[in-house]
Curated annotation (Swiss-Prot):
A Pfam family annotated for this UniProt entry: MutS_IV
Protein species of origin: Burkholderia ambifaria (strain MC40-6)
Lineage: Bacteria, Pseudomonadati, Pseudomonadota, Betaproteobacteria, Burkholderiales
Gene Ontology biological process terms in this record: mismatch repair
Functional description taken from the UniProt entry: This protein is involved in the repair of mismatches in DNA. It is possible that it carries out the mismatch recognition step. This protein has a weak ATPase activity.
PANTHER family cross-referenced by the UniProt entry: DNA MISMATCH REPAIR PROTEIN MSH1, MITOCHONDRIAL, DNA MISMATCH REPAIR PROTEIN MUTS FAMILY MEMBER
A single Gene Ontology CC term: cytosol
Keywords: ATP-binding, DNA damage, DNA repair, DNA-binding, Nucleotide-binding
Family: Belongs to the DNA mismatch repair MutS family.
The keyword Lipid biosynthesis is assigned to this record: no
Protein name as it appears in the record: DNA mismatch repair protein MutS
Coiled coil: none
Amino acid sequence: MTTLSPEAFAGHTPMMQQYLRIKADHPDTLVFYRMGDFYELFFEDAEKAARLLDLTLTQRGASAGTPIKMAGVPHHAVEQYLAKLVKMGESVAICEQIGDPATSKGPVERKVVRVVTPGTLTDAALLSDKNDVYLLAMCTGHNKRGVAVNIGLAWLNLASGALRLAEIEPDQLGAALERIRPAEILTADGATDTVPAGAGAIKRVPAWHFDIASGTQRLCDQLDVAGLDGFGAHSLTSACGAAGALLLYAAATQGQQLRHVRSLKVENETEYIGLDPATRRNLELTETLRGTESPTLYSLLDTCCTTMGSRLLRHWLHHPPRASVAAQSRQQAIGALLDAPADASLDALRSALRQIADVERITGRLALLSARPRDLSSLRDTFAALPALRERISAIVANADALTRVDAALAPPAECLDLLTSAIAPEPAAMVRDGGVIARGYDAELDELRDISENCGQFLIDLEARERTRTGIANLRVEYNKVHGFYIEVTRGQTDKVPDDYRRRQTLKNAERYITPELKTFEDKALSAQERALARERALYDGVLQALLPFIPECQRVASALAELDVLAAFAERARTLDWVAPTFTDEIGIEIEQGRHPVVEAQVEQFIANDCRFGAERKLLLITGPNMGGKSTFMRQTALIALMAYVGSYVPAKSACFGPIDRIFTRIGAADDLAGGRSTFMVEMTEAAAILNDATPQSLVLMDEIGRGTSTFDGLALAWAIARHLLAQNGCYTLFATHYFELTQLPAEFPQAANVHLSAVEHGHGIVFLHAVNEGPANQSYGLQVAQLAGVPAPVIRAARKHLAYLEQQSATQNTPQLDLFSAPPAAADELECADAPAVSAIPHPALEKLRDIDPDDLKPRDALDLLYELRTLVRSHDADGHA
C-alpha cells in the first residue's frame, strides 16, 4: 500500500483525502469511486474517462485550491462502461461503500473490492461467450553469462480456472503469443523482452514478483501440493517465476483467493502439431485474412449447442495433438454418435445439450463469490438434467472410450444439487438486492419476515376478529397510520370492556386507541420486515455461496465433460450433414487423400471439384502449375486443413484419407507489406520462407505458393529453384509447391521425389473455363490474359497485351536466346555456340491484322461494320500489290 505524506492531504476535504489514499494504491488504473447511485471519477481519471467514454466532464468546487474535475456513470449501467474500457485495454478499480452512511462519522468507509483488467474478466457481461480470455505472464531465463536461454510462460483463464505453463526458445515468443492470444501480458519492470505489437495489453509489475523460488512456493500453495513433480513442472524454473507473478496479480485484482485454480497443465513443443502465426492466418482457422469471423474453419465446425463447447472447439483447432491416439479416440466417439439408436439419437442428444448452462464460467464466478442468483438456478437446472443426458449417452458408449469417460464424468454432484434445489427459488430475481432469491422453506426466519411483509393485511383482519370475540366489542377496529403505527380503536362507549393488556396510545374525542403486546411485536416486525427480509436473504445467499465452494472440483469436472461431449456431437453433426468420412492413421511416412474437398470453400459454392493428393517416401514434393484462379491455392489449403482436421479428431471432407506422422504445418501463401515493421512484401515472403527452410522436418507439411514473385524474374526463379531443391534434398518434408515458373517443372528430372501436377483449364475463344481438377504433369500455360479479362481489365489493355505477347513469342522463336534453363550446365561462351540459321520470318505485321486487332465488335454499328469491311479489303489488296506474302 502506498503511504502519502501529510503534506499531500493538506487543504483537502476528508472525502478527497480518502479518495487520494485509494488512488495512490492504483496510480495506473481508473478508479470508479462509489457515491450513492453513481461511480464518480476525479481529476485526471475524470478527464481520461470523459474522453474514452464520451462522458460529460464537470467541475464541482475545489479541494486544496484545485478545481475538482468529475465524471460519473450510473451504478446500474456500470458493466457497459467497463466493457468499453476493457476493450480499449484499460483497467478499472471498483471502489465500493462498505460502511453504513447512517452510522458513519465523516466519509463513509470505502475500499477497492476488485480490479477489472483485460485479462481478469469473469462477469458474463464483460466476456465473449465463445472466446476464452487469458492473462499471461512471461519471465526470461538467463545463463551465467546473462544470455537469455528461454522464456517461461504462465497463462490463466480466470473465468474457468485453467492454468498452463510452458518454456520456449526466445525466438518462439511470437508464435506462442499468436497461439495463446492473451488479453493482458505481465512483464517485469525493466525487462527488455520485445512483445510483438498487438499481442495484448502490457502491464508492468515489480521485478521481484517474478522471483523463481517465491513463484514455485506460491504455485505449490495454490495447488495445495508439496512439489510440482506430479505436474511435470519441477524443472520449469522460468515458467514458475512467471506463474508466481501471475497468481499474485490475479489474486490482487479479485481481492481474494483463487479457489478454482486447483490444477496445472504443462505444454511442451512436441505435444501439438506446430502452427506458426503465418499458418494460422493463411489457413483461416478462426479468422479470415480480412479479419472477419466467417467464413472460417471454426465458423463451419461450430454447431455446438453450448458456449463451453464452442470455446473448447476453438482450443482444439489451435492445439491439434501430434499423437494420433487422441484423434482416433474422438473419431471413435463420433462414429458411435452417428450409429446411435433411435431413442438416443444424435439430434435428441444435441437437443438436450441446448438446455445446458455455461457451467464452466458459473463455476469460476462461484469460486470468486460473485455468482448471481440466476447463475445458481442455471447450475441447478443443468445438474438436474444430467441423469436424462446420461441415459442417452449410456445407450451409445459401446466401443467408444471417450464417451465412456464423458459419461462417468457427468455424474451429478448430489449434495450440491440438493443444496441448490432447497436454497434457490425456482425463478430467482436477477440480483440479490431485489429479493425473491432464496426458496421458501429454506429458512424459517426469512419465511416469517416474508409472511409479515406480504400478509400484513390478513394478519390485521385475523387479529381484529380475535379481539372482537375476546372483548365482546363488536365495533373494535385494528388500523394503521404513519404517525402512530398500528393501533386498536375502541369507541368511548365501549372502553369499559377493554382488557387489562391494552395500553392507551392516543385519545380522540369519540374514541380511544390502544396497542397490545401482540400488536406491538407485530408492528416491530412489520415495519422493518421487508428491510430485514432483504438483509436476511443477503446473508443466506452468502452462506449458500460459501457452502457451494467445496463442490467446485465436481462442477469443473462436469463442465469439462459437457464441453467435450458437445464438440464431439458437433463433429458428428457436421460429418453427417456434409458427408465427411473418418480418416485413418499410419506410422509410415505419407499422406493419401482421395477426392478431398476444401471444407469452407465447398460450403460457399454450389459444386466443388474433389481432388486427390498423395505423398509418400518416394513422392515428397508436388510442383503445382496452372492458371491463376485455377484452384492451386485452394488445393494446397484443403490438403493442410484436411490433415489438421484429422489430427484434431474430426471427420474429413474426402472419400478416404490416411495420414502418417505430422509434426508441423507451414504455409507461405500470399504476402503483404509489413509497414509497421518496415518490411517489404518480398522481405515478408523471404522471412516466412527462411523459417520453413530452417525448421521443417521430414514429418512437416509445407505449403509454398508462388515463392519468388516479389522480385525480378531471374532472381525469383533462381530463389524458387534453390528453395524447392533444399526442401527436397535437406528438409525432406511433404511440400506443395505452386509456381508460375515453368522452368521448375524440370525439377523431377533431377529429383525423382518431386512430381508435376497441374490444374486444368479449357480455352474458349479469348476466354477460359477453369476445371479445378488436379492432373499429373505440368501445365502448358498460365492463361494470364484470360484471367485479366475475367477480372475486368479494360479491353484496349487486353488487346495491347495480346499484341505484345505475340511479339515476345515471335522474338523468342526468331532469336538465338534459348530459354533460361537452371537445370542444365552453364552456357558456353557466345563464340563457341554453333547455331543453325533460323528461318526468316517477317517482322512486319499485316496492316489488315493490325486493324482487326484494334476492333471491338461490340462497339460497332451495322453501317460502321460495313464501312470497315470495305476498308479491310482495300488494305489486303494494297498489301498484296506491294509484293508481301
